[in-house]
């Protein structure tokens, strides 16, 4: 039996609101028999009614009863398929948020013949019933999990179909390219070149560029989705842990005058300017014979490589120490595409002339026109300027642009597969391989892109993997 039909037989039910005690909970019922199974449990103005005749999308105040037991007073709303989230008949029951009440209503529904929904089953049905494509369905999970404005905006773009439109356009271009090449296979006896080779390669190049742009956006998209990784680095005792505590507004890291106090990385997140940042306080890098501290330093090096933004902290009162400047210079030289913000800490005791001199020294040492930010992590000075700089970095990164950003690891992998298939086709073209072999790679690229939106999905295992990560009531 086709996966499009085997999963949609039962009428399912689940709590659609978050677990725990609350003022209100919503229980969702969906399936062909939703109205028939809920009707015996619901009394409207003291009488049982046939919910199939209820006015769609109209709230009804009544009672949920089972075997003469009043379970709760509820607000019930009916949605007639296909005009519902799942495109099936749907009933939503808003009850009091008691754990007992939720459980009793679910028990009553199951006694009537409903089945408890699996994780993501409502959204899965919406996809299988054509209410949304697969990438939009995955966006639902991202919207639910979003913690910041940027995460929410990125997921909403995907849900509203812009992402799917871009992918479908790419797929159509690939189909056109394949069609032009396969014409020669259909008419081998004709000594005619159906497609100009130069035009074919130009079209292939255009598609590759579009794919690469989407692939390259994944680093930013993944960072926004999971929290932009920011490493706080510097030699020992420059105030890295104090800076983390000040940013977070709590004593997250131990602060001490003893060198090497931070022996492991400490991570925490906070929202700044609509973005979620994941700060990592690293152990101060220095030569040490302490085994535990050495392990912490190695982990710090790893976290620095993973970071998208580096906060390089120096102690403004000890700037003459060569190891401070040498260490920051090494980080600067190895930063690659990462953004580095230079922070001069303990600046509360520095005169204006000293600040100017320090700024010039650091700019000369790093061969950069970028000026450092002077802060006092202990007193909170300069922290607002730092937060503004972090926000500005993200604003100019493209995170808020209209361009689509890939944030889903599955999508990224499939886009890479499509890109690699096109590269193989291009290489085979240059080697003079036959048209039938070239079109195999094109078909692979088409399938990979189609799997993102669900147009090429044939495996139930793939759908199970995707929707198993949803919560029960979605």
UniProtKB/Swiss-Prot annotation:
Q: Which residues form the TrmE-type G domain?
A: 227-395
Chain ranges passing through the membrane: none
The record's comment on cofactor binding reads:
Binds 1 potassium ion per subunit.
Q: What is its EC number?
A: 3.6.-.-
| Residue sites binding K(+) per the record | 237, 256, 258, 261
Q: Which terms does the UniProt entry file under GO BP?
A: tRNA methylation; tRNA wobble uridine modification
Q: Which residues are (6S)-5-formyl-5,6,7,8-tetrahydrofolate-binding? A: 28, 92, 131, 474
Subcellular localization, per the record?
Answer: Cytoplasm
Q: Which superkingdom? A: Bacteria
Q: Which residues bind Mg(2+)?
A: 241, 262
Question: Keyword set for this entry?
Answer: Cytoplasm, GTP-binding, Hydrolase, Magnesium, Metal-binding, Nucleotide-binding, Potassium, tRNA processing
Q: Which GO terms describe its cellular component?
A: cytosol
Q: Which GO terms describe its molecular function?
A: GTP binding; GTPase activity; metal ion binding
Cofactor(s) in the UniProt record: K(+)
Iron recorded as keyword: no
Residues that, per the record, bind GTP: 237-242, 256-262, 281-284, 376-378
Q: Subunit composition?
A: Homodimer. Heterotetramer of two MnmE and two MnmG subunits.
Similarity comment: Belongs to the TRAFAC class TrmE-Era-EngA-EngB-Septin-like GTPase superfamily. TrmE GTPase family.
Q: What does this protein do?
A: Exhibits a very high intrinsic GTPase hydrolysis rate. Involved in the addition of a carboxymethylaminomethyl (cmnm) group at the wobble position (U34) of certain tRNAs, forming tRNA-cmnm(5)s(2)U34.
NCBIfam families referenced in this protein's UniProt entry, alphabetically? mnmE_trmE_thdF (TIGR00450), PRK05291.1-3 (NF003661), small_GTP (TIGR00231)
Protein name from the UniProt record? tRNA modification GTPase MnmE
Name the encoding gene, please: mnmE
């Amino acid at each position: 039996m086709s996966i499009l039909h085997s999963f949609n037989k039962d009428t399912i039910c689940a709590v659609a609101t978050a677990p725990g005690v609350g003022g209100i909970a919503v229980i969702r019922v969906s399936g062909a028999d939703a109205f028939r199974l809920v009707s015996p449990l619901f009394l409207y103005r003291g009488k049982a009614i046939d919910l199939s005749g209820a006015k769609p999308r109209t709230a009804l105040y009544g009672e949920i009863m089972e075997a003469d037991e009043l379970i709760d007073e509820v607000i019930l709303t009916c949605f007639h398929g296909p005009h519902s989230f799942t495109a099936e008949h749907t009933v939503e029951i808003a009850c009091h948020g008691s754990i007992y009440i939720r459980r009793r209503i679910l028990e009553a529904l199951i006694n009537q013949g409903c089945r408890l929904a699996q994780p993501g089953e409502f959204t899965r049905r919406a996809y299988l019933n054509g209410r949304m494509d697969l990438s939009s369905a995955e966006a639902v999970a991202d919207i639910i999990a979003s913690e910041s404005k940027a995460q929410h905006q990125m997921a909403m773009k995907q849900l509203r179909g812009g992402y799917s439109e871009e992918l479908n356009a790419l797929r159509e271009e690939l189909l056109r390219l394949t069609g032009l090449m396969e014409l020669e296979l259909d008419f081998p006896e004709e000594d005619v070149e159906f497609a100009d080779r130069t035009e074919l390669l130009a079209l292939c190049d255009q598609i590759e560029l579009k794919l690469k742009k989407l692939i390259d956006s994944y680093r930013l998209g993944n960072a926004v989705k999971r929290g932009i990784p920011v490493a706080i680095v510097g030699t020992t005792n420059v105030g890295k842990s104090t800076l983390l505590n000040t940013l977070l507004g709590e004593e997250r890291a131990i602060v001490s005058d003893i060198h090497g106090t931070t022996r492991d990385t400490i991570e925490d997140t906070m929202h700044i300017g609509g973005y979620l940042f994941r700060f990592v306080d690293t152990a101060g890098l220095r030569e040490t014979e302490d085994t535990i501290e050495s392990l912490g330093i190695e982990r710090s090096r790893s976290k620095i490589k993973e970071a998208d933004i580096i906060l390089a902290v120096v102690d403004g009162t000890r700037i003459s120490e060569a190891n401070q400047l040498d260490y920051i210079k090494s980080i600067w030289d190895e930063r690659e595409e990462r953004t580095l913000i230079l922070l001069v800490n303990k600046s509360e005791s520095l005169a204006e002339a000293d600040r100017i001199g320090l700024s010039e020294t650091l700019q000369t040492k790093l061969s950069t026109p970028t000026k450092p930010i002077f802060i006092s992590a202990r007193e909170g000075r300069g922290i607002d300027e730092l937060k503004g700089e972090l926000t500005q970095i993200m604003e100019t990164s493209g995170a808020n642009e209209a361009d689509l950003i890939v944030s889903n690891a599955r999508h990224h992998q499939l886009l890479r597969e499509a890109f690699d298939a096109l590269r193989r086709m291009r290489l085979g073209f240059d080697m003079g391989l036959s048209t039938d072999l070239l079109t195999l790679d094109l078909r692979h690229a088409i399938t990979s892109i189609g799997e993102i939106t669900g147009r090429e999905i044939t495996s139930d295992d793939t759908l199970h993997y995707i929707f198993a990560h949803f919560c029960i009531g979605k």
